[in-house]
Each structure stands twice: as C-alpha cells, then as structure tokens.
Amino acid sequence: MDIKINGITVGNDAPFVLFGGINVLEDLDSTLQTCAHYVEVTRKLGIPYIFKASFDKANRSSIHSYRGVGLEEGLKIFEKVKAEFGIPVITDVHEPHQCQPVAEVCDVIQLPAFLARQTDLVAAMAETGNVINIKKPQFLSPSQMKNIVEKFREAGNGKLILCERGSSFGYDNLVVDMLGFGVMKQTCGNLPVIFDVTHSLQTRDAGSAASGGRRAQALDLALAGMATRLAGLFLESHPDPKLAKCDGPSALPLHLLEDFLIRIKALDDLIKSQPILTIE
C-alpha cells in the first residue's frame, strides 16, 4: 500500500524516501543551513526528501534539558523551510491541541513512540486527515502495531506510515530486530515501513540524564535495515554533533551525508531491482 505526500510516493516497493533533518529546532539559521544541505544532496542523488525536525522535545529526561523553540515559533520556521525549498515537512505532536495548527503547516504528523497508545492524541491526529507516521514504541512487539493502526483507521484516517526505532533490550539499551520489519508489513496490510536509524542508536547511562549514542554504527545498522525492502529511512544530522542540544551522540555529522546516502541508495536500488522472493 503506497502513500502519497505532495507527489512523493512512500511505499515498500518504491524508491526509498529520506525523512531527514535535525532532532530539534535550535534556531532559524541552523535549520535552513541543515535543510539546504539535505536538499542539495538528495537532489543530486535523486532521492525523494521530506524535512524532519521537532519544535518541542516534550519527553526529555531532565526538566533542565533543552526542549525546542515551541509550537508558535516552530511553525514559523517550518513555513520558511517550505517557502524556501518547496519540500514537505514532518514533525511530531505531544498533545491533542497541537494537532490542527501543525496540520495546517506540516504535511506529515508524527506520533511519538512513548505516546503511541494515547487514544485522545490518536483521535486528534486522525481528525486532521494528514499522513501520520507512527513510531513503534520500544516496549511493543512489531505485531502489536496493528492495534495502533486499527485505532487510527477507526478514527477515520488510514494514511499511515510505520516507523521502527528499536526495542528495549534489558536496561538502558536498544536493539533492532530485523525480522520485525516484515512482521509489521504482514500484520498491518503492507503499510509503508520506514527505519529511524538515529534513535535506534541511543544508549542510556544510569549516571546521566542525557542519552548516549553509537553513531559510528549508523551506516551498518541503516544498511541492515534497508536490505529488508523498506519505504524509507529516518535520519537526523547536525553540523557539529558535539554542540547539538539533543541526541548529539546519535546524530550523523552533516558533512558525511552524501557519502552515507550514496551507499544507502545503492543498496535500495539493488534490492528493489529484483522481484520479491517468497519462501513458504
């Protein structure tokens, strides 16, 4: 089942779509700088592109951690991104009252993993009629995603994308079950499945409120996931990850973006040049 976003086809058998950008909006200049580089690289490589950023990181571990520029300022920045680059935008919401204002600016609304079972939020998101990206919670199995999908459908919106972002593996660690991509496709009617490689690289340190990360393994993990015939890749970057205000240890350094995507596209082209082989 394919989803259309401003002329971009998102489907498991279509060329992969990049949902990429920054973790959280820091200011207008850095946002435009990052987006401009993504646009330049993806146009050069012929990769469909949707810009990603959060206006608010509402689930930070510490009350003192940076959260973002807020809804009002965030929507102004997204409007400038769309006006300057002519590309679709995806962002996440955390409360029902945010859904309609976000839907008026952004093309895709994201349901955060920690909030994926919140019925009031699901209903408000569904009511917008926008395409929805559902992050798979770390605490749910891939097959349980069908319950969230059904909730959206019964609320009136079947324009859904499913996003893997790792599963809890004991304490303070995430792993990605590569078999889970196929399970989500099979149990959810072959909805588009994308892979958030950035957040799958997170680690936790019991002595710190900040997340750690393993960005050195980003390419290995991304290639492994994309080999399962996915609709897209979800990727966060930063011009200088050491200075990022959120999740810097998992962010891909912006200057490596082109070399990274060359490898992802080569694999995606190879996988999708072959017919699906069904093994019973």
Curated annotation (Swiss-Prot):
Q: Which GO terms describe its molecular function?
A: 3-deoxy-8-phosphooctulonate synthase activity
- Any single Gene Ontology cellular-component annotation: cytoplasm
Q: What is its EC number?
A: 2.5.1.55
What reaction(s) does this enzyme catalyze? D-arabinose 5-phosphate + phosphoenolpyruvate + H2O = 3-deoxy-alpha-D-manno-2-octulosonate-8-phosphate + phosphate
Chief site of localization: cytoplasm
Sorted alphabetically, which SUPFAM superfamilies does this protein's record hold? Aldolase
Its EC top class is transferase
Output the superkingdom of the source species: Bacteria
Question: InterPro entries of this UniProt entry?
Answer: Aldolase_TIM (IPR013785), DAHP1/KDSA (IPR006218), KDO8P_synthase (IPR006269)
Write the record's keywords in alphabetical order, separated by commas.
Cytoplasm, Lipopolysaccharide biosynthesis, Transferase
Q: In which pathway does it act?
A: Carbohydrate biosynthesis; 3-deoxy-D-manno-octulosonate biosynthesis; 3-deoxy-D-manno-octulosonate from D-ribulose 5-phosphate: step 2/3; Bacterial outer membrane biogenesis; lipopolysaccharide biosynthesis
Q: Where in the cell is it found?
A: Cytoplasm
Q: Which GO terms describe its biological process?
A: keto-3-deoxy-D-manno-octulosonic acid biosynthetic process
User: Would you identify the family this protein belongs to, as annotated?
Assistant: Belongs to the KdsA family.
State the name under which the record lists this protein: 2-dehydro-3-deoxyphosphooctonate aldolase
Name the species this protein comes from.
Answer: Neisseria meningitidis serogroup C / serotype 2a (strain ATCC 700532 / DSM 15464 / FAM18)
Corresponding gene?
kdsA
